Amino acid sequence: MKIVFFGDSVTEGCFELSFHNVEGVTDIIRDKKSVYHNILKERIEREHPELNIEYVNAGISGNSTVDALKRIEQDVIAQNPDVAVRCFGLNDVAGMSLDEYVSNMEQIFGTLKEHGIQVIYMTPNMYNTYVHGDVLPNHADMAAVLAGIQNENRPDLYYAEAKKRAEKYGCAVADAYRVWKKLSEYGVDTTELLSNRLNHPTRAMHRLFADLLYDEVVRLAEK
């Protein structure tokens, strides 16, 4: 079985931000070993060595559903996968209308299903809920904007509509966002669970994504 992970910076494997004062440049620390689909791969290889699965990372930092539609043919369909895990939203909720996001999601689900690809829609993590002291100075304004969006519960609306479209096309749903919200409701400081204190989950929280995907991926591989 071949599975493509189609998403943004979280899927690519982006974590902390580092600031170089001399050049005035912010770098993203990438860690392909700690990304959720590699954690998933290692667990399946350990617990189900009989399964033959090829894993493809098609995550690109900064991508939205607009970008996804531009590269879906090359990065997903041309790979001829059996399964596609798609996780977009972090770069949509902050700068795109709900109607456009829903329309784009519908096109993505529809295109993948037309090509006979099994789809798992994984909802993203939360944004920060306040401006953390670790946020780089040149990202403080962004942190304030994202906190406002999260505290208005705007992502709830976007991902709820996306789940409806996923169900319409018979896609499985791994609802990571719901788990993050539950953690927040239980008093967990979810901003501390973000490696860049903005929108990139910590390495430990990538394990949550892997755990949510595990059963469905194994089920599909055993078919």
Pin down the residues of each PLM region.
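Serine-esterase "nucleophile elbow" of acetyl-processing enzymes
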Residues: 1-58, 71-80
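Alpha-helical cap/lid subdomain in secreted, periplasmic
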Residues: 39-54, 67-223
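Histidine-bearing beta->alpha loop at or near hydrolase active sites
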Residues: 62
